[in-house]
């Protein structure tokens, strides 16, 4: 074999030059070029040095000064639900695709033309705060009659942007057996016309879950596969290369036609075996339904599974177990120490007759899961719920210590004292700074200006030494991580631009870390991803603007030009 051929065997597969390579290493150093071979980074440095690693068959990309970041890690997303609640499987009813009730009605009417009689029509994303009719008249809300006007034979179920409210037509109510006589379930609400007592078509929280969701026809395996492929294509187009599926398992079997069910894990595995995953997937297992998950469910699910955190591969792995502690602030179901402005303080969404019983049940679940070698990600938004989760984490780790890296999902109102406790015990937070941008305008009226300004205290978490990653919670929020960075840097609201809690703003570098290396830490994978360093997975995204210097109000509009996963180009918009 000649010298040239021997060199080609050692040469890089891909060389990227003339770029601004933001490595996100410990020094946040900037390089010009990077070389990749067999899906891994083999060199990072100056153009003249990296070019020497190119052989006859090496692909060379000249970025002409464009910026490169490590692949983005969305650490709390419902990816298959995101894909399954978007076209072609569902109707697009989120802003800015629709701006009025009439727009939504028109979109549903078009969908009716493409489905069989009796087939369910679903959608996600409507928001009264952006519907023209609701803005013009605050007493105007979406109704079943709106949807009945275009769909009398097909049941319709449209989730609002938060996923905690649904808007349905009369056919859906009929199939669910919901009438004016239906009692309102604990932890939920059936909105009824005050004049007639008839359901208006809006159902909230456990009323939506327990009455309507369970009668929606389960999607086929092929439809779930299509949902995953749709999601991955969209995620790659914006630079996302890793995700944590926020909840999949038997507890999600009745959500949106099975989009959080156990079969979804099997479908992911099929795609992994076929080499068709273009996003690295970490899965949190869900063993019981929202509001009904008990210690008995956890015992059955965890004790006999025979798995633990880390089972799987670089592409598909079990991350841990998902629990729900409370609800969300906009619904006043987040469990708070201090009452909401209008009264009430929320509560734990766990079986039990009293706060004490529910608290004890939560602690038992945490201790049991930790003992069996699973990382825990617990949905907790209110300060009292977060404190309860941290109580459980500390008790569990004291009884059975290991490098669990348990974390709170959301962590909206984490208190200064709780931050100290989290730092001492290596407990993290998975935040969604983009949701702060979406909701901060109306939080003042719910919890008062002081607490509203504190919500998602990113600077306090950083200063306190707490690891926090960032994500979208899609389909609750579109997974535009650039919007999330802008929100973390500016803390301006979506509707009015009002700054909420300026003292909690963080730098661009810190925000970028939350979407890259901090996500890798949460995944127990910081040694192989999260930064552009020798030996790590070659997951990169290329941007058309310099995210470190562009006007901060333009960060959200930066285009992704290219996404690379494992050294392969999976998206290219150059």
Where do the language-model regions lie?
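Short helix-capping segments at alpha-helix termini
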Residues: 273-278, 310-311, 396-403
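Structural alpha-helical segments in enzyme catalytic/regulatory domains
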Residues: 309-311, 318, 423-426
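Divalent metal-binding segments
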Residues: 10-17, 22, 26-303, 319, ...
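Short loop/turn motifs at secondary-structure junctions and domain boundaries
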Residues: 6, 23-27, 313-314, 521, ...
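His/Asp/Glu-enriched, well-ordered alpha-helical/loop segment
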Residues: 226, 367-377, 384-406, 410-411, ...
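Acidic, glycine-rich loop-and-beta core segments that form the ion-binding/anion-interacting portion
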Residues: 306
């Amino acid at each position: 074999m000649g010298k040239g051929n021997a060199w080609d065997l050692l040469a890089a597969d891909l060389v990227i030059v003339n770029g601004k390579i933001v490595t996100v290493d410990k020094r946040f150093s900037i390089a010009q070029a990077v070389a990749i071979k067999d899906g891994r980074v083999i060199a990072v440095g100056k153009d003249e040095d990296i070019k020497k690693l190119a052989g006859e068959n090496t692909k060379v990309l000249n970025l002409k000064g464009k910026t490169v970041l490590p692949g983005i890690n969305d650490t709390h997303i419902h990816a298959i639900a995101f894909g399954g609640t978007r076209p072609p499987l569902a109707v697009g009813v989120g802003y800015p695709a629709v701006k009025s009730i009439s727009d939504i009605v028109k979109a549903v009417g078009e969908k009716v033309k493409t489905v069989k009689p009796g087939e369910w029509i679903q959608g996600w994303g409507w928001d009264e705060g952006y519907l023209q009719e609701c803005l013009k008249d605050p007493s105007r809300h979406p109704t079943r009659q709106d949807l009945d006007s275009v769909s009398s034979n097909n049941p319709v179920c449209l989730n609002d942007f938060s996923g905690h409210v649904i808007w349905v037509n009369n056919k859906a109510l009929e199939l669910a057996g919901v009438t004016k006589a239906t009692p309102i379930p604990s932890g939920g609400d059936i909105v009824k016309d005050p004049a007639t007592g008839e359901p208006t078509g809006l159902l909230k929280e456990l009323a939506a879950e327990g009455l309507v969701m369970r009668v929606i026809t389960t999607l086929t395996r092929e439809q779930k596969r299509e949902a995953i492929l749709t999601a991955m294509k969209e995620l790659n187009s914006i630079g996302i290369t890793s995700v944590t599926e926020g909840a999949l398992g038997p507890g999600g079997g009745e959500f949106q036609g099975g989009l959080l069910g156990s079969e979804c894990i099997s479908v992911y595995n099929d795609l992994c075996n076929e080499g068709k995953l273009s996003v690295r997937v970490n899965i949190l297992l869900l063993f019981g339904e929202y509001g009904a998950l008990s210690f008995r469910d956890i015992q059955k699910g965890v004790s006999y599974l025979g798995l633990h955190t880390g089972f799987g591969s670089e592409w598909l792995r079990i991350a841990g177990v998902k629990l729900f502690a409370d609800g969300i602030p906009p619904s006043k179901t987040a469990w708070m120490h201090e009452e909401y402005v209008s009264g009430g303080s929320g509560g734990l969404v766990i079986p039990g007759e009293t706060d004490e019983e529910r608290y004890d049940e939560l602690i038992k679940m945490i201790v049991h899961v930790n003992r069996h070698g699973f990382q825990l990600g617990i949905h907790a938004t209110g300060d009292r719920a977060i404190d309860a989760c941290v109580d459980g984490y500390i008790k569990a780790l004291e009884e059975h210590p290991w490098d669990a890296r348990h974390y709170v999902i959301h962590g909206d109102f984490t208190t200064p004292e709780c931050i100290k406790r989290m730092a001492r015990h290596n407990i993290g937070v998975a935040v969604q700074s983009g949701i702060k941008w979406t909701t901060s305008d109306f939080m003042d009226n719910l919890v008062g200006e002081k607490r509203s300004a504190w919500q998602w205290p990113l600077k306090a978490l950083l200063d306190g030494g707490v690891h926090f990653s960032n994500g979208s919670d899609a389909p609750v929020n579109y997974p535009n991580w650039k919007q999330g960075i802008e929100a973390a840097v500016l803390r301006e609201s979506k509707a009015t631009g009002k700054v909420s809690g300026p003292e909690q703003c963080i730098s661009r570098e810190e925000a970028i870390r939350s979407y890259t290396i901090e996500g890798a830490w949460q995944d127990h994978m910081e040694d192989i991803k999260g930064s552009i360093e020798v030996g790590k997975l070659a997951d990169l995204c290329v941007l058309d603007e310099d995210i470190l210097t562009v006007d901060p109000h333009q960060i959200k509009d930066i285009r992704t030009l290219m996404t690379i996963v494992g050294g392969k180009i999976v998206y290219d918009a150059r």
